[in-house]
C-alpha cells in the first residue's frame, strides 16, 4: 500500500497543494517554513483514520486542528489517494472554523472504513498472520528538552 496523491487545501501555509507521489521514494527538501512538516503532518492525520479504524471499527483518527486552518480562511480540507495491489481508493477530511457554515464541506471517510474492515477480515481469516500497512511518523518536536545551562567539567 502506498500514497498516490495527497492534497492540502487551506491547510497551514498551503492554499491548494496537490502532490502526486511516487510509489517508491519521495524526498521533501526546502528551507525552514516552506511546508515540509505540513506535508508529513497532513499524511499522518489522514493515515491515522485508517490505522485507528483497523484497531477499532468506526474509531476516529486525528482531526484537523482549528490552528491548522490557513490564516484568513474559514475551512481546511485534506484528501488522500492510496493504492493497494492495483486498487485505488481514498478519503477526505474537512474542518470548519467555529462560527462558520459547514455547508458544502464534509468529511468522506467511507473508504477508510471499508479498507480497515478488509484488513480486519484478513487478520481474522488468517489468525493474525497477515501483512498489514506500517505507518511510521516522527514529528518535528522530537528535540532534546533537558539541556544543562552550565558545563560541569573542564575541557
Regions found by a protein language model. Give the residues of each.
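P-loop NTPase switch/coupling surface
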Residues: 1-155
Amino acid at each position: 500500500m502506498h500514497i498516490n496523491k495527497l492534497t492540502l487545501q487551506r491547510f497551514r501555509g498551503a492554499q491548494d497543494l496537490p502532490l502526486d507521489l511516487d510509489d517508491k521514494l519521495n524526498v521533501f527538501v526546502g528551507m525552514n517554513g516552506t511546508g515540509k512538516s505540513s506535508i508529513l503532518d497532513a499524511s499522518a492525520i489522514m493515515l491515522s483514520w485508517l490505522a485507528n479504524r483497523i484497531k477499532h471499527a468506526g474509531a476516529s483518527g486525528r482531526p484537523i486542528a482549528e490552528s491548522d486552518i490557513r490564516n484568513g480562511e474559514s475551512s481546511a480540507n485534506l484528501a488522500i489517494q492510496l493504492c493497494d495491489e492495483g486498487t485505488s481508493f481514498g478519503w477526505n477530511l474537512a474542518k470548519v472554523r467555529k462560527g462558520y457554515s459547514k455547508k458544502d464541506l464534509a468529511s468522506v471517510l467511507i473508504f477508510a472504513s471499508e479498507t480497515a474492515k478488509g484488513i480486519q477480515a484478513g487478520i481474522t481469516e488468517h489468525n493474525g498472520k497477515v501483512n498489514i500497512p506500517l505507518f511510521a511518523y516522527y514529528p518535528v518536536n522530537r528535540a532534546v528538552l533537558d539541556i544543562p545551562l552550565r558545563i560541569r567539567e573542564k575541557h
